[in-house]
Amino acid sequence: MLIELNGIKKYYNSKKNRIIALDGVDLKIAKGELLAIMGKSGCGKSTLLHILGGLTGINDGAYRYRGEKVDFENKRKLAEFRRKNVGFIVQDFALIGEKTVYGNVELPLNTRKLSRNKREEMVYEILNRVGLEDKVRRYPYELSGGEQQRVAIARALIHNPQLLLADEPTGSLDEENQRIILNMLKEVVKNGTTVVLATHDIDIAGECDRYRYISSGKIKEPEKI
């Protein structure tokens, strides 16, 4: 099992009260699985993805990755965990407007000691996989929404992560581009990467290997939706 969550709790304290984002979440995710996390806005989907990616800590429970407990208190190990294992995609693409497609995709390689030729080889290889090798010198504003999301996917995959987290990756796209992105994620899974995507769309969730529903910070079985 790639991931095991046991009794995960996450809350935020405001001046007036405590906001519970996740309330005792148990979840297992297998290697090479395409899993959808469904739910309405504010239900805890994004928080769950951030925990899986080591971007935010937990208040209680345990997160095990490949059988080893993720230590949220050790910032150095946590950063290493993210760098080695995790790719992240968000709905609004989060591309840097001043950088070309090449520059955006190359960003995750800045922490690695690679020759210019090797970096170029890796960037062109991943852009070829997402069908954007002819857009390499374009800027984000020159691309369609679907193309921008493909750039974001390429950037997330450039360091070959074992875990790809996608937060509403098709939410702002038309039906044709939704299909393109979903098929792309399925190909990623075929290559051995585990993909967890957050969505509010039952049709998107139905295309995944399985899905789980979050309501009021708790995981519900599909038959209980």
Model regions: which residues?
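Helix-to-loop junction immediately C-terminal to a conserved catalytic motif
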Residues: G53
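The feature captures the beta-strand-to-loop junction immediately N-terminal to the Walker
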Residues: M38-K40
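Catalytic Walker B motif of ABC-type/P-loop ATPase nucleotide-binding domains
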Residues: L164-D167
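Conserved ABC ATPase signature
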Residues: Y139-Q149
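Short coil-to-helix segment of the ABC ATPase nucleotide-binding domain corresponding to the Q-loop/switch region
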Residues: K99-L107
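A short, proline-enriched helix->beta-strand linker immediately N-terminal to the Walker B motif
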Residues: I158-Q162
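Conserved ABC transporter NBD signature motif
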Residues: G61-F72
